[in-house]
Amino acid sequence: MIPQVSQEIIDLGDGRSISIETGKLAKQADGSVVVRLGNCMLLATAVSARTSNPGVDFLPLTVDYREKFAAAGRFPGGFFKREARPSDSEVLTMRLVDRVLRPLFPDDYHAETQVMIQLMSHDDNVMPDALAGLAASAALAVSDIPFYNLISEVRVARIDGKLVINPSRTELEKSDIDMMIGASLDSVAMVEGEMKEISEAEMIEAIKFAHEAIKVQIHAQQKLRAKLSSQEYRTYEGEVEDEAVYAKVKAAAYDKCYAIAQEASGKAERGEKFATVKEEAKALFTEEEYAENADLAGLVGKYFYKTNKEAVRNVILEKGIRLDGRKTTEIRPIWCETDYLPSVHGSSLFTRGETQALATVTLGTSREANQIDSPSEQGEEKFYLHYNFPPFSTGEAKPLRGTSRREVGHGNLAQRALKNMIPADCPYTIRVVSEVLESNGSSSMATVCAGTMALMDAGVQMVKPVSGIAMGLITDGEKFAVLSDILGDEDHLGDMDFKVTGTADGITACQMDIKIDGLRYDIMEQALAQARDGRLHILGKLTETIAAPRADVKAHAPKIITRTIPGNFIGALIGPGGKVIQELQKATGTTIVINEVDEQGVVEILGTDPEGIKTVLAKIDALTFKPQVGEAYEVKVIKMLDFGAVVEYTAAPGNEVLLHVSELAWERTENVADVVKMGDVFEVKYLGVDPKTKKEKVSKKALVPRPPREDKKE
């Protein structure tokens, strides 16, 4: 059977085009497409259950993105030679797509839904993560799954002042903006990226530019759907509703929730008070009513949440009072401390309200760099950040199941916020670890602040300190309130989570998630302006604690010295089977790493003992010392022989040469000891390699004038 293939082409306007094709692959999925740009091909599939599982009151959506090694003509690493758990880059792409899709499904759609995106063919000039959102939305578009508000995602960069959509990796290296934008036709839903200290106006310009490109891609999806014979969305059983129950719960709970929202209480106290009101709402109904109506308990819980959310939002909109009593632009109290942990290379504590992060910095050689090996990217990171969010940080006891997607995403955001402030000539590999010890909103921004101070405490010469803030939004369509430094509850009950990091001079990273349709750009501009004021306030608190990086690393932290040697000396420094370098490391207590770069050997010496480092440098100097013919060098006698003296260059201890008896003096020398003695230091002239003996020659007499010859007596 010949497949019925439908296709749409998207012209990118720069000689490139994206094709979206359906009808050839994975036809048993509810929807499947192949998206292609150059030789990069992504297969995206969408499948959703026909019914919801009982008791499920949320959308169980799974977005999975994988890059197949075969796509790049490579074998997977490891013993089993098979793709295993997703890499961090794959997890980050999953999150980018999920965050745009999830809020645009119908609120009452609770069927198990799975969107899978696979890189099937790789192109070195195409970054596949920028096509994943388009592929996912297109797979939903050609299905009967009720996803009415199509989306797409693009990467926007600015290269030499010009904005570019979906640049290549090579082009991106020259860019000062790297942002992923996800949007529907009407509004931007997601922003994430890093920048090199750009202004708020420049960021808005880039978002608008990307949104126009996204609209073109959404129109292409609509055209593709229109070509299909079946364009009907499936019917589904939505949530059970009962207006009478809602009215009863709201009448009993709204005023109480409204009052609690104005009391400026702490997280735990406020939670207990809301829980009491919820129990009172449950008690409005008898045991017989619960027994007769299996849905009643779930309805009461749902309607209480709805009532509570409405009350809290209205207090903010009507009175400008937040749950903890702050004004909309007010930042929570901040206290900071550096050098908290005595044995680590750098540490800091950052506490803002009920959110606390403890950051540590570890310094190492290039051997400790984070290796990246995926079908679409190979390389290493010399600066990386890990974010840990244990359950006790929110007062909970939960199973520990390894690093979560959320931890990967938050760590990546904080890493991108700081990375461009690490000097390009920093010789260290740097690992920052953030332990979130308390959390009540914007722990990732606390990580940025703690990370900045820990880096400065470690003696890393940051270009500029970085701070971060999370902004929120409450709107009813007419009135709106932009909230600075949001609480966890304000994140859950609000319409936006907008994290912004930067220096005093510009934005370094951002992450925005919009939960409503049609966010106006003027609101976004106000949020960015308000975020800047908040960032600068927080930055002032950081610099009050530590005004500048330490002049040097701490005494117990390793110091690193880098020395470049000719490539042909690498083998001599390593020695047979690594003997020379291993003995040198053991004797000096150092770590020595050698990398070959452009036919040169880049030697990194890491150690806590300055004398040990000096010994290694002296050994390198000795091994690589190469005297020039005709030049004079200072030497020291280390051995006396009948036919001369063995001397070593004082500039390269261990580098020895024979000073032959015939080169000691112009006069005939019967006894070497008559001219030089053990330990004598003097200069010799380097004569080069003797063509007969193939050994190096030096001369002491060549540096003194030759005495005139005496005429023979007749």
Curated annotation (Swiss-Prot):
GO annotation, biological process: mRNA catabolic process; RNA processing
Disordered as annotated region, ranges: 694-714
Residue stretches making up the S1 motif domain: 630-701
SUPFAM superfamilies membership: Eukaryotic type KH-domain (KH-domain type I), Nucleic acid-binding proteins, Ribonuclease PH domain 2-like, Ribosomal protein S5 domain 2-like
GO cellular component labels: cytosol
UniProt keyword list: Cytoplasm, Magnesium, Metal-binding, Nucleotidyltransferase, RNA-binding, Transferase
CDD domains: KH-I_PNPase, RNase_PH_PNPase_2
Annotated positions binding Mg(2+): 491, 497
Example GO molecular function: magnesium ion binding
Cofactor(s) the protein needs: Mg(2+)
The protein's Enzyme Commission number: 2.7.7.8
Similarity section: Belongs to the polyribonucleotide nucleotidyltransferase family.
Protein name: Polyribonucleotide nucleotidyltransferase
